[in-house]
Amino acid sequence: MPVDLDDVKQLSKIDQSNMMAAVDRFPDIFLGPRNEPQVSLKEVRSSFKSVVLMGMGGSASAADVVLDWLRAALPIPALVHREPGLPSFVNSRTLFIALSYSGETSETLAAFREAKKRGSSLVGIGHGGSLASICSDFKAPYIQVEASLAPRAALGQLIVAAAVALEKADLIRSTSREMSKAAQELVRIRRRCRIETPLEDNPAKGLALRLLGHFPVLYALQRMSSVARRFKNQLAENSKLLAKYDLLPEGGHNEVEAWHERDNLLPVIIRDAQETAVERSILRAFRTTISSASRSHPLEVRVAARGNLSKLLSPILLLDYVSVYLAMLRRIDPTPNTLINEYKKRMSR
């Protein structure tokens, strides 16, 4: 018997840990008060030459969003780092921001300690754990975020905290107004995508049904890489479904050649409502090429949103809903991550 996405009682039995409630809460994070660091960030201000945002998993996803959003506003180079070793440029002129919701991420802790040895200015972000203790030992600022169901469900809290860190370090202007505007658009998306909205009016339920039984291949413009990567990760963690992503225009110079056969692949192109003429040309050429070569019919995900932050958060929220509905269609509780936990246990031996 297939799952009825309009049967709230049936869906609640599948979503035993209530991941849907965590997704519903996402807009509220950007409407509420912002957590300020326990130690003044005046202590880390200096003439920075670079910024490194360190994280893994859901914590790194927050860093991805922050850089896609604020990279153009930052006066110095910045990158997201995802391994324990550090690049050679990290030194005393680097602002090193470690994001770890659990505070126990081994790669993040190792990189944080190495950054300390190199004299970098340090900031920690998370919900306690060893990172908070290390920040206390190092007398480094620490921003504590609110509790959440899982690290990936703390995306909003981590984005806000990272933006606050950059503000307090005098690298960007206040982002509170832009967050409030983005929250208003997120509330509208929640209204359309929440579990009570019927399938015929719910774009997230419709997309989940289209994805069921397929291997999603995701594409987005380079400036929206955080959205594509987040959706790929949410399909893995929530839907327990393999997917991949690539970015344009780069994908038009290599990956497009692989679309001679469709197999069970379903291309999904993530777009926004404010593309330039050049961007529209890139997306149109790519879509037409893979469609004609593979006879596939790419899905397009486009959310009307204004503002640099809204253009990222709006599709992220929509696609987070999709990943939970797809898990329900597959009769899978979205929350447990047994293989991730097994991997971490093996790494700790």
Question: How should these model regions be labeled?
Answer:
Residues V80-E83, L241-G252, S296-R306:
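A generic structural motif
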Residues F30, A162, V322:
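A residue-level signal for conserved active-site and pocket-lining positions in enzyme catalytic cores
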Residues E257-T338:
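C-terminal active-site/capping subdomain that shapes the small-molecule cofactor and substrate pocket
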Residues D15-R25, R34-L41, S46-K49, E167-L265, ...:
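Active-site phosphate/pyrophosphate-binding segments
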Residues V3-I29:
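Generic N-terminal amphipathic, Lys/Arg-enriched alpha-helix
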